[in-house]
């Protein structure tokens, strides 16, 4: 389980990215890099980390499901992920 502060920091970044998304897109299109530089660093989408929605784990996360590999395996074996089953051929 990731620290609550790390999860909160990532959530804050997600909110900042959403807040400045339009302005950032306009500035990039206009080529105004001086104004881009003055925006908050955390308003860049690059700084947001994909994290598991259950555990907050930052590595081994399947973006399609929003789950880390451990939780994905656990939930799929329990049958709690619709349409997912163990491969057999």
UniProtKB/Swiss-Prot annotation:
Belongs to the universal ribosomal protein uS14 family. Keywords: Ribonucleoprotein, Ribosomal protein, RNA-binding, rRNA-binding. One of its GO terms (molecular function) is rRNA binding. One of its GO terms (cellular component) is cytoplasm. SUPFAM superfamilies: Glucocorticoid receptor-like (DNA-binding domain). This is Small ribosomal subunit protein uS14. PANTHER family: 30S RIBOSOMAL PROTEIN S14, SMALL RIBOSOMAL SUBUNIT PROTEIN US14M. It comes from Chlorobium chlorochromatii (strain CaD3). Part of the 30S ribosomal subunit. Contacts proteins S3 and S10. The keyword Amino-acid biosynthesis does not apply. HAMAP family: Ribosomal_uS14_1 (MF_00537). One of its GO terms (biological process) is translation. The gene is rpsN. Binds 16S rRNA, required for the assembly of 30S particles and may also be responsible for determining the conformation of the 16S rRNA at the A site. It holds the Pfam family Ribosomal_S14. NCBIfam families: PRK08881.1 (NF006477). The keyword ATP-binding does not apply.
């Amino acid at each position: 389980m990731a620290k609550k502060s790390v999860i909160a920091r990532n959530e804050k970044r997600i909110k900042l990215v959403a807040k400045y998304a339009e302005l950032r897109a306009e500035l990039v299109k206009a080529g105004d890099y001086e104004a881009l530089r003055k925006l908050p660093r955390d308003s860049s989408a690059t700084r947001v980390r994909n994290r598991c929605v259950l555990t907050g784990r930052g590595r081994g996360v399947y973006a399609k499901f929003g789950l880390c590999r451990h939780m994905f395996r656990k939930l799929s074996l329990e049958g709690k992920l619709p349409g997912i089953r163990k491969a057999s051929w």
